[in-house]
Amino acid sequence: MIDAHDLASWMIDLAERRLTGVYNATGPDYPLSIGRVLEESKAESGSDAVLNWVPAEFLEQQALQAWQDLPAWVPDVGEYRGFFRVDCRRTVAAGLTCRPLRDTIRETREWAATFTPDHEWRAGLSRARERAALAAWHARQGRP
């Protein structure tokens, strides 16, 4: 995951320095899991949300597709194995810097707050589909 501000700033810097080449601009120079993003999001927002970690097989049973229904997530199996493990050292050496994750989260939350609470996002699951998937998961786990 990379903050668009960081990417844009770096690209302008490259142009000003007349640097060209192939770069993997995928995020910070450390491993960043979706779990960490979600935990940091909870902490930044003060949310008491409960994260439900479910196996990829369950998502498939619910007809939830990697990347389509769940943006920024793919199972680490088969054709997707290693999908998010991209070496970006060359990019960092060329000057890419990434702001702290919590800054990106805070700015994204501020932007999202400009929409009405009932706004239906075009990316990701609808509220109804999310509720149905969670209900199925909780039923499978014997929880209400």
Report the location of each language-model feature.
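Mid/C-terminal beta-alpha module of Rossmann-like enzyme folds, strongest
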Residues: 13-79, 87-89, 106-109, 116-144
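Short, well-ordered beta-strand elements within core beta-sheets of diverse protein domains
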Residues: 92-96
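Acyl-CoA thioester-binding alpha/beta core of soluble enzymes
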Residues: 97, 101-103, 111-116
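A conserved structural motif in NAD(P)-dependent oxidoreductases
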Residues: 1-7, 100
